[in-house]
Amino acid sequence: MEKRTWLTVPDIAERLDVSPSQVRRLIEDRHLLASRRDGVVSVPEVFLTDEGPLPELRGTAILLGDSGFENDEAIRWLLEPDDSLGVAPIDALIAGRKAEVRRVAQALAF
């Protein structure tokens, strides 16, 4: 897996000019996926745009959760290259391939 930068809740709050509680709400509502890294809640930086969470992420995160993926598993799947997509699913989402990513994610449930 390609090395990615991770941001803590305070990092994200500062970057988006919101409170840490608003960042935690984004995580609770699955606009962002977070994982504990060395005991600290962190989010892959690639899940954010300059304006906020990557808009395509939430629906994909909900689909993965409905398919039985825990947050750590969903994050791993999003960040690791996928043979059927040719790139990591998060990179395909950023490139505008939302429907294709979600089809692949949906197939994982079966």
Predicted regions and their residues:
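Non-transmembrane "mature" sequence context
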Residues: 1-110
